[in-house]
Amino acid sequence: MTAQIIDGKAIAQSIRTQLREKVTARKEAGQRVPGLAVILVGADPASQVYVGSKRKACEEVGFISRSYDLDTSYTEEALLALIDELNDDPTIDGILVQLPLPAHIEDSKVIERIRPDKDVDGFHPYNVGRLAQRIPVLRSCTPMGIMTLIKSTGVDTYGLDAVVVGASNIVGRPMTLELLLAGCTTTTCHRFTKNLEQKIRQADLVVVAVGKPGFIPGEWIKPGAIVIDVGINRLENGTLVGDVQYDVAAQNASFITPVPGGVGPMTIASLLENTLYAAEQYHD
């Protein structure tokens, strides 16, 4: 068996096309164009690339994108004051603060300062809590994008044994909640997990987000399983690889996401979907 590739790039492009059409329809109806504020503190090269991709995608679908590139020395107090301004700005539907932040700024304080109805990253405790209570509104972008990828396979998720490897606030934990909502029997694995191989070998669906190249050997993948690889790791020779040993895993899986071109584009597409949702549901 050779796995079918889940083409995140193509699915994300389709979502962006639909969003562009909706924005055009809003304009024609005399409605406001959705606005997204993107804040970057410092000059982390990876963050700069991510932020650039998000801004470009915003412009492609016709959103207003407002950029704030702040120096590393920018204080926490000043950043919180900027967020307060944007919270009160009626032209801004979503506020995105690129993580990680410099050491002198507390991530949780910044995330919680963003008004929940403008939290298009889906990180605010209110929005995570809504997901936990099975009434999601603004959902965490990467897990939301992954659910779109899984749905594209046509596989019924109810009753599947799912394993999430990684328990971060950004991917692993909300991913577990999304899979529970989709009817999976879900196991979350982390650095204290024992018998990881045994758990992976039994899984119908595996989502891996640990940031370690080839962390999951391909032979662990159960024949016919769905494999979602969230990792993007750059090797010394410049090659980008995921957290799963792709070549071998692709021989066992029924569906697999490539790296790059799998989960990454969907994270941005979900961010755009959340921004339009915030405009329509909260701010129109």
Curated annotation (Swiss-Prot):
Record-linked InterPro entries: Aminoacid_DH-like_N_sf, NAD(P)-bd_dom_sf, THF_DH/CycHdrlase, THF_DH/CycHdrlase_cat_dom, THF_DH/CycHdrlase_CS, THF_DH/CycHdrlase_NAD-bd_dom
UniProtKB keywords: Amino-acid biosynthesis, Histidine biosynthesis, Hydrolase, Methionine biosynthesis, Multifunctional enzyme, NADP, One-carbon metabolism, Oxidoreductase, Purine biosynthesis
Pathway listed: One-carbon metabolism; tetrahydrofolate interconversion
Keyword NADP: yes
Molecular-function GO terms, alphabetical: methenyltetrahydrofolate cyclohydrolase activity; methylenetetrahydrofolate dehydrogenase (NADP+) activity
Annotated GO biological process: L-histidine biosynthetic process; methionine biosynthetic process; purine nucleotide biosynthetic process; tetrahydrofolate interconversion
Pfam families: THF_DHG_CYH (PF00763), THF_DHG_CYH_C (PF02882)
One GO cellular component term: cytosol
Homology family: Belongs to the tetrahydrofolate dehydrogenase/cyclohydrolase family.
Assembly mode: Homodimer.
Protein name from the UniProt record: Bifunctional protein FolD
Lineage: Bacteria, Pseudomonadati, Pseudomonadota, Gammaproteobacteria, Alteromonadales
Gene: folD
